[in-house]
C-alpha cells in the first residue's frame, strides 16, 4: 500500500519540474544578452514539458506565472487529492483519483478528436476533485498566515469564477498566499485564450522566478 501511494503522489517530480524553470530564469536575470537568451530558451523548453500552452514567445513573468499555476494546481492533483482518497478508500481510491486526473490532462482539452472522451474525463475529474480542491485551497491559504486574508478573498472573489472551479480555487489560493497575480490571457495552439486574472489584492505583483521557489511545498 505504501509503495502504491508513493507512486501516486508526485511531490518530488513537481519540485523538480518547478526548479527546472526557476533556475534558468534566475540565471537569465543576471546574465549578458547571449547568455540570457540561452537561459530563457532553457526555461521555455522546461516549461513546455509541464504545460499545454504555447511557450516559444513567453516572457519571464509569463513563464513564472505558468509554472506557479501548474505547481499550485498539481499540489491538488498529485499530492492532496491522492492522500484524501487514500484515507477514504485506500489504495484503490488513490489510484482512481490519479487515473481520472491523468485522463483529464490527456483528453480534457476540447478538441474535435477527443471531445467525447474529454468531456467524460473532465466531468469525472471535477466530481472526484470537489472536496480535495477545497481542502487544498484552505491549506494553501493557511500556509502563509500573513497573507491568509488575501488568499481567502482571492478564493472567494476570483477562484470561483475560473472556468474550472476546482483549479480556480487552488490557483487563486496560491496567488493570494504569495500575494501575486496569476491567470490572465494565454496562448494555446496558436490561439489567445481570455482568462480571468487571479489574485484579489490591489498590491499583488506579477509572478517572478523567486516566487516559483516559494510556491513549492
Role assignments for model-derived ranges:
Residues 99, 103, 107:
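Active-site His/Glu-centered metal-binding helix of metallohydrolases
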Residues 1-95, 108-217:
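Hydrophobic alpha-helical transmembrane segments
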